[in-house]
Amino acid sequence: MRLFTHGQVLALLAFVNTISAIPSFSTNSYPAHPAEPVSIFSQHQPQAPLGLWTRLRNSVIERVWGVPPQQRHRGGNKHQYPPFSAPASLRTRYGDDVVLRFKLQTADEVKALVEASNILFLDVWSSTDEWIDIRLAKDVVPSLLGLLPKSLQTTHVPLIRDLPQTIYESYPSPFQSASGHERGFLPSGEPSSDVTNIFFENYQPLSVIVPWMRLLASMFPSHAQFISIGSSFEGRDIPALRVGVRPANDQKRRRTLIIEGGSHAREWIGVSTVNYVAYSLITSYGKSKSISTLLEQFDFIFIPTINPDGYVYTWETDRLWRKNRQETSLPFCPGVDLDRTWGFEWNGNATGDNPCLESYGGDKPFAGVEAHQLAEWVKEQTEQRNTKFVAYMDLHSYSQQILYPYSYSCLSQPPNLENLEELAMGIAKAIRLTNRKTYAVSSACGGLMASQKKKAKPETFLRMESTGGSALDWFYHDFGVKYAYQLKLRDRGSYGFLLPRENIVPTGKEVFNAVMMLGRFLLGESNAFQELDWDAGFQRPNKDDKPILNDDDDDDDADTNDDGIGRKDDSWIPDEYKGDNDRDESDGGWAFRRLRKR
């Protein structure tokens, strides 16, 4: 328990009083569930559940002053409620969209899938050396299959059959999760008994994250500072936490690590994970010798989302929005991909003059406002603030991968490739020992590689999208950060970007231990990659961590054969279209409707 001085307690009280005046975020911020149980505090006086900030305030008071927490299940209410249907607004926006996975074996298959995706303006969710996930309208599936070779027509796997419903169930309930209502498609689980984890029981909107960050900084002023990296296109601050303890009169350049998430707005798990790691380091200082040493030797810059405009947009309008929200040459296709707009090997020609593409990198290097703001900030810190950036970790989702430079090309190798691979394997080991999750380690070049066991050499495939202009490559090559990684977090496709909230804390612990492993490596510890020392600051999995995904293996494809190859599912194809490879004018109509929905 961290001790507070009298002055700090008074300051915290003043801040908590300020926070308590902030109204709970409106249910208009996301599709509210149409019915929720009401907590009964007496037989005659029903009361609405406590607002989020009231509960956060109470949890702070309970933690700091040792007030016994109130019982979280009043009256023993443990009734289960049936899932509610997605509201009409979501059905209108997402229609009958689904997500399919295609297993790839040959370069011709990849080429055909790339061309078909571009023709139909399809949303590619993720791609690895084994599969590609694509979102599309159900009635467009036969048209897509008609453009593909027969081998792909028989190897598509349904991942998400009802996208609007899955999106609806990914939003947090405006009521406390302990109320007893659990989403119907998830196994029920008790909320964490640790009152300090209340913030991580759900994904949080930006209107909650920023005051929470300020609260942390005010509680722990000795080693946490709330800062702004710059301003977004719409004028929002890009919030961050600087965590570390710099000795007085220290003239050495301060070694600093950046841990960033949310450059792609829809990847909520990256935002929550950055917050979790920051919280864990801040609250463990002075309790763990290993963590205290890290914060005395390094500064950590935690940026939950470099894309605040896009993140807010995913809460208020389109849950699956990827880019930022700045204007482009086409008024109905706003946004720049903030991970394709950086200056090193920017490849804007790959996306042409089409701002409607999800990977559009802008019309020039650093066209993305927020990427330019971050680049200018790190330059200023280096030139004027005596800072040396030694590591960069960019959190994305999904597919469970640890990627190192380069992203723009598989033909170039970084000079310290062996060290990058060694550390990446150590990070993967730390994650595996935490929750038995397997993360693949590879270059981020993005060239899909055929996994054909009969071939002596893998075959380089055509890419699904441009991979130039990445933040990973810029920090490594242009800015000289020796250890730069992109982590693609859970899962491997069962939920994709709509990862249920039960995974927030387990994923946070995995990445926290990965950061601890990174810190030990940077400190030069000779035993950094040996078994995790659970008494040296690493976080153990516990009974409250109930990941809903299979931990026995990481093949999350529910609809696969025993050999791992997907089977054809004719339920996606209307009877009148089976065997008919002709396209009609409805293809273009669906694509245009999708663009207009933006």
UniProtKB/Swiss-Prot annotation:
Cofactors, names only: Zn(2+)
Domain Peptidase M14: 202-522
Cofactor notes: Binds 1 zinc ion per subunit.
Subcellular localization(s) per the UniProt record: Vacuole; Secreted
Glycan-linked positions: 349
Its biological purpose: Inactive carboxypeptidase that may play a role in cell wall organization and biogenesis.
Coiled-coil residue spans: none
Bias type Acidic residues, positions: 550-562
Keywords noted in UniProt: Cell wall biogenesis/degradation, Disulfide bond, Glycoprotein, Metal-binding, Secreted, Signal, Vacuole, Zinc
Species for this entry: Ajellomyces capsulatus (strain H143) (Darling's disease fungus)
Gene Ontology terms for molecular function: zinc ion binding
Propeptide stretches in the record: 22-174
Organism phylogeny: Eukaryota, Fungi, Dikarya, Ascomycota, Pezizomycotina
Sites where the protein binds substrate: 264-267, 322, 339-340, 397-398
Protein name: Inactive metallocarboxypeptidase ECM14
Protein family per UniProt: Belongs to the peptidase M14 family.
Tagged with keyword Zinc: yes
Top-level division of the source organism's lineage: Eukaryota
